[in-house]
Amino acid sequence: MRAVVVLSLASFASAAALRAVDPLLPLLAEAFGTTAGGASAVITAFAVAYGFLQVVNGPLGDRIGKYRMVFWVTAISALGNLACAFAPSLPLLVAARFATGATVGAIVPLAMAWIGDAVPYERRQPVLARFLIGHMLGIALSTTVSGGLGERYGWRAIFFVLCALYVLTAALLWFELQTNPATRQAQAAREPVTQSFLRMAGLARGAWVRVILATVFIEGMLFYGALAFAAYHAHRYLGLGVGASGALIAAFAGGGLVYASVAGRLVPRLGERGLVLGGGSFIGLGYLGLALAPGAAFAIPCLAALGMGMYMLHNTLQVHATQMAPESRGAAVALFAFCLFSGQSAGVWLASNAVDTAGTRPVFIVAAIGLPLLALDFRRRLAAHRLTLAHG
């Protein structure tokens, strides 16, 4: 479906903005006379806005149309990245990143919600996995290009590139809205924003919804709190330059792409519980290996394992998120994203303090222990949920 391909490009742009700053932390710290932990405020601010503005973006998407909302936030995000490129100080860069995160944050959740409206549940997980190919490529290319551009032209260069990318993506989304009836028809009935807010607040009363939201919050805190410092770890402890350390993170996206390419066969073979168990195992091994890696060559398969494991676990959570409230799917998936990026914000803040005092390895080890335990707990709860549904 062409509409999904364009949404995948929007997801690419979203991921590019999300992860492009990671390899630039050493350059930002040097440019603004601060530590890597201090420079990581640009990551935290983006994640905070990305998460907290979901409570607005989701209901608006339900009201005005999810695909149309993705177009508008993509167009506005181009201006946000331009503001980042011209920021004269770290506080203003943090403010510009916060503003950009507020709009970029709506892209993936509303795109997922639109897919939830358009694709039946039994076919949804492979479609979501293919949609996320754009997201994974965005991570891979943004960290690689950002690091290389940063070394050659300075940290501002990547934001000009991102601005151009968002302009192009917005143009393609607008074309789809004008020419593809599916972008206007495949959505739940539009309801008042206030009703969508009330429905979002009421979701937390469901026991299974609370499990999904709590799990994704902890996942975001442990996984992305540690991943934000993977490029810095490669630069500081593995002896790589800024460009090479950014390119190294592409291995993470490579692992995710492997999952996306085999998801159609893997999902029916392993089932949801098998995906969760395998995902937790890959993540634990990946972070433990990264903490102990003696060199970059050893770190590459560790990052690939992280990508494979993360998308096995997270894709399962995403599918359940699209079913939390089918009648108000934009608000429901936005609440899911709110919890994910609230967790990431907390994780990056906690990790930044640990990195400045104890280095990156303790952060990776905590993630290596905590995430497999989280996966085991969710697997157990998933089995109990299936039994509850089976017995009515």
Predicted segments — roles?
Residues A96-G134:
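Cytoplasmic helix-loop-helix junction between adjacent transmembrane helices
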Residues F52-P88:
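Conserved MFS/SLC helix-loop-helix module at the cytosolic interface between two early adjacent transmembrane helices
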Residues L53-G65, Y259-G271, V355-D356:
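Helix-to-loop junctions at the C-terminal end of transmembrane segments
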